[in-house]
Curated annotation (Swiss-Prot):
Keywords: Ribonucleoprotein, Ribosomal protein. Belongs to the universal ribosomal protein uS10 family. InterPro entries: Ribosomal_uS10 (IPR001848), Ribosomal_uS10_CS (IPR018268), Ribosomal_uS10_dom (IPR027486), Ribosomal_uS10_dom_sf (IPR036838). The gene is rpsJ. Involved in the binding of tRNA to the ribosomes. This is Small ribosomal subunit protein uS10. GO terms for biological process: translation. Part of the 30S ribosomal subunit. GO terms for molecular function: structural constituent of ribosome; tRNA binding.
């Protein structure tokens, strides 16, 4: 695993939750002795949905809802087996989606 990079992508609706999770991951990786790059904040995806308040008519009366998806990117350079084991045992809060990919340098 010496010439590989582990890329971790975090997604969540709450930015406080995602920042705390990224901090946990970075702290765990640094304890195992691997080099870490990040967290890099990626653009926030904002989805807006407009619905009518009334059932039949009154098209002028509308309501808008939005859902923001925050993303963070963490790269672990040359992860060791100890790093992979520590990350697999790490407990993350509900509401944080984690995607882990390994790639060659």
């Amino acid at each position: 695993m010496a010439n590989q990079v582990m890329r971790i992508t975090l997604k969540a609706y709450d930015h406080h939750l995602i920042d705390a999770s990224a901090g946990k991951i970075i702290e765990t990786v640094k304890k195992t002795g691997s080099k870490v790059s990040g967290p890099v904040p990626l653009p926030t995806k904002k989805e807006i949905v407009t619905v009518l308040r009334a059932v039949h008519k009154y098209k002028d009366s509308r309501e808008q809802f939005e859902q923001r998806t925050h993303k963070r990117l963490i790269d672990i350079i040359a992860p060791t087996q100890k790093t992979v084991d520590a990350l697999s045992r790490l407990e993350m809060p509900a509401g944080v989606y984690i995607d882990i990919k390994m790639k060659a340098k």
